[in-house]
C-alpha cells in the first residue's frame, strides 16, 4: 500500500538562513523508510558515523589552524557579492583608480580582416642586406688577393735584406720622424697654428651661439612682404565679415547662459556625468580617470541627442568624447532585433583602425558589437560581419559606399547617429563627392557629431552635412598647439635647399635619435629617404599610400614596438594617429598650410606629455613658418631657433651624394622584384579563373557612383589640398613685372651678357668696327650677291667650275 501523501507536498518550500535544520527534520518525519531495509540502513549508518567522526576530528584540527591565519584569504568566490561591484581606490587623493599604465592601442581588430595569401611584399632591408653580403664577399676576395701580393713582397724584401750589408740598418725612430728642415716641414707653420687657433675660437663661439639659440625665442627675419601680409592679417582679424557672423548666429544653437545665483555644473569626474557602470569600468580599463575639457563639455550634450560641432587641440581625447556618449545611448537600445545604429567615418585607414581599438576597449564590459570596414582588408570578412548587423560601423568613406551599393545584407535605413572625425578634412575637395553620396542616402532624422583640431568655421560647409541647430563646443582657441610642445625651426639660406637631406641626417644621427616621426610631402621622397636611412645604419620604417595595408600595419607596429627608431611618413599619418612615446616630429619641409602643420606636430606632446617639433624651412616655406610662429606667440607656446653648422650638413650631404649610384641600383632591384611579384600574382589569378570560372562569372559586377574620370579628378583635387597645385599656376598673360623677373632669372643662369651702350645705339663703338671688318677691297660686302643669293641651287647637275 502506498504511503499516505501529505497535503503540503504540493507546495515548493523555500530556503532561508535559519530554516536548514527544521526543514531536514520535517522531511525526515514525513518520509518514513521501508521497515524491511532498517537493518541494512543501520549498518550503513554505523559505518558512516565512524567516517564522520574521523572527518570531524580532521575538520576540528583544520579549523584550529585556520583561526591562526587571516580570515578569507584562501576562500573562493561564493557569489555572495555582486561581481560588478568596484571599490573606488584613492590615487593621490584625487579619486582615480591606481591602475597599471595603459600600453596603447593595437591593430588586432584589423589583422583578422587582412587578405590571406602568399603574396610577399618587397622588403628594402632584405635588398640592402643582400647587397652588403655581396660586397663582403667581393671584399673578402679582394683582401685574399692583397694578402697574396703582400706575401710576395715580403719574400722579396727579406731576400734583399739578406743581401744588404750590416751598416745599412736603420732605426725605427728615424723612420717615424722627419727632420725639421725637410721638404714641406715648417712651411707655413705659423699660418696653420693661427688658423687652428681661429677655428678653435670660432668653434667655441659657435657652441655659445648654439646654446643661446636653443634657449632664445625665434624672431622671424624681416622680409619686404612681411609688413604687408601682417597688415592684411590684422585687417582680417579686426574686420570680421558681418554676413558670415549672422549666418553663424542663425545656424548654431544659442549658448546657454548661466543663471544668476545658480552653481555652475562641473563635470569634473566621469561619475558625475551619470554614466552606466559598464562604461565606467571600460574607462577604468584604459586608464581614463579624469575627463578632459572637451570630454566634460561634449558628453552631457551628446547624451541629450543634440548635434555637436567640437574642436580641441590634438591629443585632447576627442575620440573618447564621442565614443562614450554613443556607447551610453546604445546600452538602452532595443535588443530583440539586431540593428546597425551608428556610423563613424574617418579619412584614413589607420585612424579608423585606431578608433575601432579605442571603442572595443571602452565597450569591453558591454554587449555592443563593432564592425571595421576600411579599404585594404578582406571584403568577404567585412560582409560576413555586416550580415550580423553590428551596432557600430567604423569605416572610411570609400569602403562604406562600396558596401552600401554592393553588399545586399547591409542597409543604412536604421542609422541613428553619424560621427565625422577629422571633419575639416572630410569636408575638403578630395572627400566631398563621397561624403555627399553618403549624406544623401542615410536618414535625415539622425544625430550628427563633427570633431577636429582645426574645425572649419565656414557655415556653408557645415550646412552640407545636414546639421540641425548644432551646439558649438570649442575648448581651445582655433589653430593652437598643445601647451607642452616646443617648436624648433632650422632656416636654410638661399642656395642650400639641396642640402636638406644632410640636415635631416645630422638631426637623426646626433640630436633626435629615437621615437621620431619624419613627415614628407610626397611618397617618393619618403621612400628615397627610407633607402638612405637604411644605407646610413639608421633603423627606419615608412608609411605612405603606395604600401599595402599589411605593410602599413607592420610599419606602424614596428615603430610602436621599438624595432624602428624613425617613422618616415606622408600626411597619411598626420591626422589622429596616437602612438605612445613619440618624442619628436621632424618636418622635412614645411607643409602646404598651417592646418596641416598643426596636425603633423600634434603627433607628439599628447595627453599632457612633452614633445618637440622641428621644421627644416627654406624661403618658399616662409608663409607657413610665419603663421606658426605668430599663432604660437599668441598662445604663449615656446618657439626656438636651432642653428646647425654648415660643415656638418655638408659632410652628410656628401655622403648622400656618394650613395646616389647605390640608391639607383636599389630602386632598380626593387622595381624588378615588384615586377616578378606582379607576374606571379597574375599567374595565380589566371589559374584561379580557370579553376573557378563559373563561380567568378556568376558574381554580380561591383558598381560605383562615379566614373573613372570623375574619380581621377577627385583624387587630383585631394592632392592639391595637401601639396598645392602640382603644375604651378595656370598659364596666362604675363605682366611686365613677371616678365622682368623671368629675364632677371635667365640672366643669372646664363651669366653676364653684353648689352648695347650709347655709342652702339649712335652707330659708333664696337658694332661700327665689326661692320668695317666685314667689307672687302672693292667695297662690296662679303658673301653672295643679291641676285646670286636669290638663285635656287642645283640638286642633280654637274658642279660649276
UniProtKB/Swiss-Prot annotation:
Family: Belongs to the DEAD box helicase family. DDX27/DRS1 subfamily.
Residues that, per the record, bind ATP: 312-319
Lineage top rank: taxon: Eukaryota
Keywords: ATP-binding, Helicase, Hydrolase, Nucleotide-binding, Nucleus, Ribosome biogenesis, RNA-binding
Subcellular location: Nucleus, Nucleolus
Motif, Q motif: chain positions: 268-296
Motif DEAD box boundaries: 421-424
Catalytic activity: ATP + H2O = ADP + phosphate + H(+)
Region described as Disordered: 1-79, 97-120, 132-244, 726-801
Protein name in UniProt: ATP-dependent RNA helicase drs1
Known partners and oligomeric status: Associates with pre-ribosomal particles.
Enzyme nomenclature, EC number: 3.6.4.13
Domain text: The Q motif is unique to and characteristic of the DEAD box family of RNA helicases and controls ATP binding and hydrolysis.
Gene Ontology molecular function, alphabetical: ATP binding; ATP hydrolysis activity; RNA binding; RNA helicase activity
Gene coding for it: drs1
Species assigned in the record: Sclerotinia sclerotiorum (strain ATCC 18683 / 1980 / Ss-1)
Ranges of compositional bias, category Basic residues: 785-801
Acidic residues bias spans: 18-32, 156-179, 193-214, 227-243
Matching InterPro entries: DEAD/DEAH_box_helicase_dom, DEAD_box_RNA_helicase, Helicase_ATP-bd, Helicase_C-like, P-loop_NTPase, RNA-helicase_DEAD-box_CS, RNA_helicase_DEAD_Q_motif
Function: ATP-binding RNA helicase involved in ribosome assembly.
Amino acid at each position: 500500500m502506498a504511503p499516505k501523501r501529505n497535503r503540503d507536498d504540493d507546495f515548493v518550500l523555500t530556503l532561508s538562513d535559519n530554516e536548514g535544520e527544521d526543514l531536514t527534520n520535517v522531511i525526515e518525519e514525513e518520509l518514513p523508510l521501508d521497515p524491511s531495509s532498517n537493518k541494512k540502513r543501520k549498518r550503513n549508518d554505523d559505518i558512516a558515523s565512524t567516517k564522520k567522526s574521523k572527518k570531524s576530528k580532521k575538520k576540528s584540527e583544520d579549523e584550529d589552524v585556520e583561526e591562526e591565519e587571516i580570515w578569507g584569504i584562501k576562500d573562493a568566490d561564493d557569489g555572495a557579492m555582486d561581481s560588478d561591484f568596484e571599490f573606488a581606490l584613492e590615487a593621490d587623493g584625487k579619486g582615480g583608480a591606481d591602475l597599471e599604465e595603459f600600453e596603447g592601442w593595437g591593430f588586432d581588430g584589423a589583422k583578422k580582416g587582412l587578405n590571406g595569401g602568399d603574396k610577399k611584399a618587397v622588403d628594402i632591408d632584405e635588398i640592402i642586406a643582400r647587397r652588403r653580403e655581396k660586397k663582403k664577399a667581393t671584399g673578402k676576395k679582394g683582401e685574399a688577393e692583397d694578402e697574396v701580393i703582400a706575401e710576395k713582397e715580403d719574400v722579396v724584401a727579406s731576400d734583399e735584406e739578406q743581401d744588404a750589408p750590416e751598416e745599412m740598418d736603420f732605426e725605427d725612430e728615424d723612420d717615424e720622424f722627419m727632420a725639421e728642415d725637410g721638404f714641406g716641414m715648417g712651411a707655413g707653420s705659423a699660418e696653420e697654428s693661427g688658423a687652428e687657433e681661429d677655428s678653435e675660437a670660432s668653434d667655441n663661439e659657435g657652441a655659445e651661439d648654439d646654446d643661446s639659440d636653443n634657449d632664445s625665442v625665434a624672431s622671424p627675419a624681416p622680409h619686404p612682404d612681411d609688413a604687408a601680409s601682417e597688415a592684411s592679417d590684422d585687417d582680417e582679424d579686426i574686420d570680421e565679415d558681418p554676413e558670415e557672423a549672422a549666418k553663424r548666429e542663425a545656424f548654431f544653437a544659442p549658448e546657454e547662459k548661466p543663471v544668476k545665483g545658480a552653481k555652475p555644473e562641473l563635470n569634473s569626474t566621469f561619475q558625475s556625468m551619470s554614466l552606466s557602470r559598464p562604461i565606467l569600468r571600460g574607462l577604468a580599463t584604459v586608464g581614463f580617470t579624469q575627463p578632459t575639457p572637451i570630454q566634460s563639455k561634449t558628453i552631457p550634450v551628446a547624451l541629450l541627442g543634440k548635434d555637436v560641432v567640437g574642436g580641441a587641440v590634438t591629443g585632447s581625447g576627442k575620440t573618447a568624447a564621442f565614443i562614450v556618449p554613443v556607447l551610453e545611448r546604445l546600452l538602452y537600445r532595443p535588443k530583440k532585433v539586431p540593428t546597425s545604429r551608428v556610423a563613424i567615418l574617418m579619412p584614413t585607414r589607420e585612424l579608423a583602425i585606431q578608433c575601432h581599438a579605442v571603442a572595443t576597449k571602452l565597450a569591453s564590459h558591454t554587449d555592443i558589437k563593432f564592425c571595421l570596414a576600411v579599404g585594404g582588408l578582406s571584403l568577404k570578412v567585412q560582409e560576413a560581419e555586416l550580415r550580423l548587423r553590428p551596432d557600430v560601423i567604423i569605416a572610411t568613406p570609400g569602403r562604406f559606399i562600396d558596401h552600401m551599393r554592393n553588399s545586399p545584407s547591409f542597409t543604412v535605413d536604421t542609422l541613428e547617429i553619424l560621427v565625422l572625425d577629422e571633419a575639416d578634412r572630410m569636408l575638403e575637395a578630395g572627400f566631398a563627392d563621397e561624403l555627399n553620396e553618403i549624406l544623401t542616402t542615410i536618414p535625415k532624422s539622425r544625430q550628427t557629431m563633427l570633431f577636429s583640431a582645426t574645425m572649419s568655421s565656414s557655415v556653408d560647409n557645415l550646412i552640407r552635412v545636414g546639421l540641425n541647430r548644432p551646439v558649438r563646443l570649442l575648448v581651445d582657441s582655433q589653430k593652437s598647439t598643445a601647451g607642452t610642445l616646443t617648436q624648433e625651426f632650422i632656416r636654410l639660406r638661399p642656395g642650400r635647399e639641396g642640402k636638406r637631406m644632410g640636415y635631416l641626417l645630422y638631426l637623426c644621427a646626433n640630436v633626435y635619435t629615437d621615437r621620431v616621426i619624419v613627415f614628407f610631402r610626397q611618397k617618393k621622397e619618403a621612400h628615397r629617404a627610407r633607402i638612405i636611412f637604411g644605407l646610413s645604419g639608421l633603423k627606419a620604417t615608412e608609411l605612405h599610400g603606395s604600401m599595402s595595408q599589411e605593410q602599413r600595419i607592420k610599419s606602424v607596429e614596428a615603430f610602436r614596438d621599438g624595432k624602428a627608431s624613425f617613422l618616415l611618413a606622408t600626411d597619411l599619418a598626420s591626422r589622429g594617429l596616437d602612438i605612445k612615446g613619440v618624442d619628436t616630429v621632424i618636418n622635412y619641409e614645411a607643409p602646404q598650410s598651417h592646418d596641416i602643420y598643426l596636425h603633423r606636430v600634434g603627433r607628439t606632446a599628447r595627453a599632457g606629455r612633452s614633445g618637440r617639433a622641428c621644421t627644416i624651412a627654406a624661403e618658399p616655406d616662409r608663409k607657413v613658418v610665419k603663421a606658426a610662429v605668430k599663432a604660437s606667440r599668441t598662445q604663449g607656446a615656446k618657439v626656438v631657433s636651432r642653428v646647425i653648422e654648415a660643415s656638418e650638413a655638408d659632410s652628410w650631404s656628401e655622403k648622400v651624394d656618394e650613395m646616389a649610384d647605390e640608391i639607383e641600383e636599389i630602386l632598380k632591384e626593387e622595381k624588378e622584384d615588384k615586377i616578378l611579384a606582379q607576374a606571379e600574382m597574375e599567374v595565380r589569378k589566371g589559374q584561379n579563373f580557370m579553376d573557378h570560372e563559373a563561380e567568378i562569372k556568376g558574381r554580380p559586377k561591383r558598381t560605383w557612383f562615379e566614373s573613372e574620370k570623375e574619380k581621377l579628378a577627385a583624387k587630383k583635387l585631394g592632392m592639391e589640398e595637401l601639396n598645392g597645385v602640382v603644375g604651378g599656376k595656370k598659364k596666362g598673360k604675363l605682366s611686365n613685372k613677371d616678365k622682368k623677373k623671368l629675364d632677371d632669372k635667365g640672366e643669372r643662369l646664363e651669366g653676364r651678357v653684353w648689352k648695347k651702350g650709347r655709342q652702339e645705339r649712335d652707330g659708333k663703338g664696337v658694332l661700327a668696327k665689326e661692320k668695317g671688318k666685314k667689307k672687302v677691297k672693292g667695297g662690296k660686302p662679303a658673301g653672295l650677291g643679291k641676285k646670286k643669293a636669290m638663285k635656287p641651287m642645283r640638286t642633280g647637275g654637274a658642279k660649276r667650275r
